C-alpha cells in the first residue's frame, strides 16, 4: 500500500525526484468535468471550483485513489484575461481570486488525505496571443502567483504553452516565489509555434529557472515521448540538468500536425474513438520510465483508470499499488470470475497486449486530415477580445473553413 499522509511532513517534489522516486501526476480536469456537465467547452475555464466544488473535489479524490502524487490546482485558464475572454464574463459574477483560491483549497484538502503534493498552475494567456508586452503578460501570471503564495502550494507548474517565449516569462515570474517550478509545453517534435526546436525550448526553460521540464497535452503519448527525448538531448548537449516530465493526451493522434489534436476535425466533441486503453497507458508508462522520465501523468482524456494504469505498470519500481487497484486485477486477471468462458479466457496479459481494437464504425476512416490554418501569435484571427465573438466574425470563419476544406 502507498505511504499514508498525516502530521508527518511530506517530502517535497524535488526531494522525491532527486531521490529517484517516481512521481505520478493527475489527469485531465477540463475535459473530464466538461463531460460531467461542470465546464463549458470553448472557454474551458475553471469556475467550477467555485460553482461546483464537490465535483472538482471528487475528481481530485479519484485521481488520488488511482495513484496520483500531485494534486494540480484546477486553475487551468484561470488568469483574469481568460476568465473574461470572448464573452465568457465569468468575472462579472466571480472574481479571478475566488476561482484560484477555491481551487487551491480543494486541492489541499484532498492532497492531505494521502501522500500528495499541491501544485499551483498557470497556463498560456490571451494577452500573449494578442501581442501584449512582457510586463503585461507577467502581471497576469503574478496575479495567480499571489494566490498560490497565500495558499502555500508546494510547488508551481507553468503548463500548456505553445510558445517558449511566453513559457519563459511564466517561469521567470514563478521562480521569484522561491518554490520549485516545473514547465511543460504543448509542443510536438517540430517545436513551438515560432519554430523553436524542443531541445532549445528545454534549454531556455532551465536557464529561466525551471527544475522540471517536459510536455503536456496536444499530442498522444508516443509523440509526446519523442518530444521529451529531443528535450533531453538538448539539455545534454548544453550540459544542463533537469528532471523530465510527461503529461500527454489520452487520445491517439498520429495524424495531427504541428498544433496537435486541436487541428483534428474531431476536436473536441468527436474524440471518443481515439481514446487510449488502459493497456496503451501501461505501455506509455514503461516507455516514459525507460526514457528517464520520473514525473509521469496525463492531460486531456486521462481519466482515473488511466492514472491507475501508470501506477500499476510502475508498481515494481515503486513498491506498492494504489488503493484503486483493490478493484482491478492485473492485466484483466479479475475476468477469471466472469460467468462466460470466452471472457474468462481473456484474463491474461497476452490477450490485451496483442488485441487489435475495432472502432465499431465500419464506414469511418482510421485517420483524419487536420484542418489547422497555420496561425499563431500576431495573426489577426488570434487577437483576443473581451466582447463575445460576433455573428459577422463567425460568418467570416465559416467561409474561410469552407475555402480551406476545398
From Swiss-Prot:
One of its GO terms (cellular component) is extracellular exosome. GO terms for molecular function: betaine-homocysteine S-methyltransferase activity; zinc ion binding. Binds 1 zinc ion per subunit. Changing residue 220 to A: Has no significant effect on catalytic activity. Changing residue 299 to A/S: Impairs zinc ion binding. Loss of catalytic activity. The modification N6-succinyllysine is found at residues 40, 93, 232, 241, 340, 377. Zn(2+) binds at residues 217, 299-300. Homotetramer. Involved in the regulation of homocysteine metabolism. Converts betaine and homocysteine to dimethylglycine and methionine, respectively. This reaction is also required for the irreversible oxidation of choline. This is Betaine--homocysteine S-methyltransferase 1. It comes from Homo sapiens.
Amino acid at each position: 500500500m502507498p505511504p499514508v499522509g498525516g502530521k508527518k511532513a511530506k517530502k517535497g517534489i524535488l526531494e522525491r525526484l532527486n531521490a529517484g522516486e517516481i512521481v505520478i501526476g493527475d489527469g485531465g480536469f477540463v475535459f473530464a468535468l466538461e463531460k460531467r456537465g461542470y465546464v463549458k467547452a470553448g472557454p474551458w475555464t475553471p469556475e467550477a471550483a467555485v460553482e461546483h466544488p464537490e465535483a472538482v473535489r471528487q475528481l481530485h479524490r479519484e485521481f488520488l485513489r488511482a495513484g496520483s502524487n500531485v494534486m494540480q490546482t484546477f486553475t487551468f485558464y484561470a488568469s483574469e484575461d481568460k476568465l473574461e475572454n470572448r464573452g465568457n464574463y465569468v468575472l462579472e459574477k466571480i472574481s479571478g481570486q475566488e476561482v484560484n483560491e477555491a481551487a487551491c483549497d480543494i486541492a489541499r484538502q484532498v492532497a492531505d488525505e494521502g501522500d500528495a503534493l499541491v501544485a499551483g498552475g498557470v497556463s498560456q494567456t490571451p494577452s500573449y496571443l494578442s501581442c501584449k508586452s512582457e510586463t503585461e503578460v507577467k502581471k497576469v501570471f503574478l496575479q495567480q502567483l499571489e494566490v498560490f503564495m497565500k495558499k502555500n502550494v508546494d510547488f508551481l507548474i507553468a503548463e500548456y504553452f505553445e510558445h517558449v517565449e511566453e513559457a519563459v516569462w511564466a517561469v521567470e515570474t514563478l521562480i521569484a516565489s522561491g518554490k520549485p517550478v516545473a514547465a511543460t509545453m504543448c509542443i510536438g517534435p517540430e517545436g513551438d509555434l515560432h519554430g523553436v526546436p524542443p531541445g532549445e525550448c528545454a534549454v531556455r526553460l532551465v536557464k529561466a529557472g525551471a527544475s522540471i521540464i517536459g510536455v503536456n497535452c496536444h499530442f498522444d503519448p508516443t509523440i509526446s515521448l519523442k518530444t521529451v527525448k529531443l528535450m533531453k538531448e538538448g539539455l545534454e548537449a548544453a550540459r544542463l540538468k533537469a528532471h523530465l516530465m510527461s503529461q500527454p493526451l489520452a487520445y491517439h493522434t498520429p495524424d495531427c500536425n504541428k498544433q496537435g489534436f486541436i487541428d483534428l476535425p474531431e476536436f473536441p466533441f468527436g474524440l471518443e474513438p481515439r481514446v487510449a486503453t488502459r493497456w496503451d497507458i501501461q505501455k506509455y508508462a514503461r516507455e516514459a520510465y525507460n526514457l528517464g522520465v520520473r514525473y509521469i501523468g496525463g492531460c486531456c482524456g486521462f481519466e482515473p483508470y488511466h492514472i491507475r494504469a501508470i501506477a500499476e505498470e510502475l508498481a515494481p519500481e515503486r513498491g506498492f499499488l494504489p488503493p484503486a487497484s483493490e478493484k482491478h486485477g492485473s492485466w484483466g486477471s479479475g475476468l477469471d470470475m466472469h460467468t462466460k468462458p470466452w471472457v474468462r479466457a481473456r484474463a491474461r496479459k497476452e490477450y490485451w497486449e496483442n488485441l487489435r481494437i475495432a472502432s465499431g464504425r465500419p464506414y469511418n476512416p482510421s485517420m483524419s486530415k487536420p484542418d489547422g490554418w497555420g496561425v499563431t501569435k500576431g495573426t489577426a484571427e488570434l487577437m483576443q477580445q473581451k466582447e463575445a465573438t460576433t455573428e459577422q466574425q463567425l460568418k467570416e470563419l465559416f467561409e474561410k473553413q469552407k475555402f480551406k476544406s476545398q
